[in-house]
Regions:
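Membrane-proximal helix-turn-helix segments that form the acceptor-binding/catalytic region
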Residues: 21-45
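Conserved donor-binding/catalytic core segment of Leloir-type glycosyltransferases
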Residues: 46, 89-116
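Carbohydrate-associated surface elements
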Residues: 51, 72
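Nucleotide-activated donor-binding/catalytic signature segment of Leloir-type glycosyltransferases, i.e.
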Residues: 141-159
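Aromatic "clamp/platform" in nucleotide-sugar-dependent glycosyltransferases that forms part
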Residues: 179
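Short hydrophobic beta-strand element within catalytic cores of glycosyltransferases
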Residues: 196-199
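Conserved acidic donor-binding segment of nucleotide-sugar-dependent glycosyltransferases
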Residues: 213-222, 230-235
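A charged, aromatic-enriched C-terminal amphipathic alpha-helix characteristic of glycosyltransferases
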Residues: 236-267
Length: 269
């Protein structure tokens, strides 16, 4: 299994810049032995997205011996919620957007604070919920204070189950500002609850999320904010993307469906 290529620290989109360059270099170098062992000695390789297939094709391993394992979502809580028909109207929801993920450079969380600052210039009372923990927690808190966004951004820490679902129910959009990703499963959770997404147009996300998410030119923070504002101010566009999001996750991301797909790829007739 090989689920994330370490970013080359000298690449433009590498999250390991400045004082973190050495850390990124060590990370990249440490992964090379595993990559070559898997590439030349494994009978079957699991990767997380379609762009990662090609690096493992060799003269002895064809494409059919490389399986994309995308991950999945338990869609049953959202399905039950929709069947009840008692959901919160968009205009009454507490959060304008939410983020779920590790507070790490790769996830674009520092960029997210600047993006939300731009959103607040147009909608001063807009609110963002951030779910997750990670090494950038302190830096994020300082940046929020520095930008005067204490009333606009709520850090909720780690949430799971009902607590996390309650945030989805109270949100209008899910944001995925990752600057480096091999697929990105976090937004799928919110999309299962009918939340349209906004992300950067990363290569891996093209096959993961062909619909349900507004893709933004990498790494244009103003354009990202504009996509958020577009969804918040256009009910018809929000509804269309919301339906696309929930349908995509229901049809392609449900765990039972994913398990069947993987089984048929690995245990071929």
């Amino acid at each position: 299994s090989f689920y994330l290529f370490a970013p080359k620290p000298w690449q433009k989109n590498s999250p390991y810049k400045g004082i973190n360059y050495l850390l990124g270099l060590v990370y990249w170098l440490s992964q090379l032995p595993a990559y070559y062992i898997i590439k030349y000695f494994a009978d079957l390789v699991f990767v997380t997205s379609q762009p990662d297939v090609k690096p493992f094709i060799t003269k002895n391993r064809k494409k059919n011996k490389i399986t994309v394992v995308r991950g999945g979502v338990d869609t049953s809580p959202a399905k039950k919620y929709f069947e009840q028909g008692d959901f919160i109207p968009i205009t009454n929801r507490h959060y304008d957007a939410c983020f779920v993920g590790r507070l790490h450079y790769q996830k674009g969380v520092l960029e997210l604070i600047h993006i939300w600052g731009t959103v607040c210039k147009k909608i001063p009372k807009s609110r963002l919920a951030i779910i997750g923990m990670g090494p950038l927690d302190g830096e994020i808190r300082s940046l929020i204070k520095q930008m005067g966004l204490q009333l606009n951004i709520t850090l909720l820490g780690f949430l799971n189950g009902i607590e996390k679902f309650d945030v989805f129910k109270q949100s209008k959009i899910i944001l995925h500002p990752a600057t480096y990703d091999s697929g990105g499963m976090a937004p799928a959770e919110g999309m299962a609850w009918g939340l349209p997404g906004v992300s950067f147009d990363l290569e891996a996300l093209k096959t993961y999320y062909p619909k349900g998410i507004l893709k933004t030119k990498c790494f244009d923070l103003d354009a990202f904010a504009s996509n958020i504002l577009y969804l918040l101010s256009n009910p018809d566009a929000h509804l269309t993307l919301s339906q696309e999001a929930s349908n995509l996750i229901r049809d392609y991301w449900d765990w039972d469906q994913q398990a069947q797909n993987i089984f048929h790829q690995v245990i071929k007739p």
